[in-house]
């Protein structure tokens, strides 16, 4: 899962939106560094990552990537899952429009930015102002995101080419997401993540 799904699952579980978004920027044990509710959000994010990576349907999704891109397929899929969530938001979350949800999330996160790592602050400077999470619904934006990640991290250069697998296998990947994500939503609502 990427930013949007982590925020959505956190909201369903009444977990810290800040903690769930911040987690990828925190190494090691966060206790003592952040308030307990943010630590709980960081830990939820980590559980979601482990759970997602071990789902049989996600493992199946990785098989759609050729050997050249299989190493980066978990990252590509995390971004793609956010695309499908944004694209199907109205179907999956009929009681709250995506822009309204994002406005709420932003209001929960921005006041705390001064107390977060500089890299997280930099991300937030673009995430909200450029409407990244809404733009995840646009497939060309997903290609741009993967290209940007590849440009920033040479070891992940294969991310740019991994978009080809998305184009080639879009429908079966979408079907997999629409099968497993509602189950994750239920688990979050029942605090089973």
From Swiss-Prot:
Record-linked HAMAP family: AcpH
Q: What protein name does the entry list?
A: Acyl carrier protein phosphodiesterase
**Its catalytic activity?**
holo-[ACP] + H2O = apo-[ACP] + (R)-4'-phosphopantetheine + H(+)
Its biological function?
Converts holo-ACP to apo-ACP by hydrolytic cleavage of the phosphopantetheine prosthetic group from ACP.
Q: Name one GO biological process term.
A: fatty acid biosynthetic process
* InterPro entries (alphabetical): ACP_PD, ACP_phosphodiesterase_gpbac
Species for this entry? Yersinia pseudotuberculosis serotype O:1b (strain IP 31758)
Q: Which family does it belong to?
A: Belongs to the AcpH family.
GO MF terms on file? [acyl-carrier-protein] phosphodiesterase activity
Supply the EC number(s).
3.1.4.14
Spans through the membrane: none
Q: Any coiled-coil ranges, and where? A: none
Pfam families according to UniProt: ACP_PD
| Alphabetical UniProt keywords | Fatty acid biosynthesis, Fatty acid metabolism, Hydrolase, Lipid biosynthesis, Lipid metabolism
Q: Which domain of life is it from?
A: Bacteria
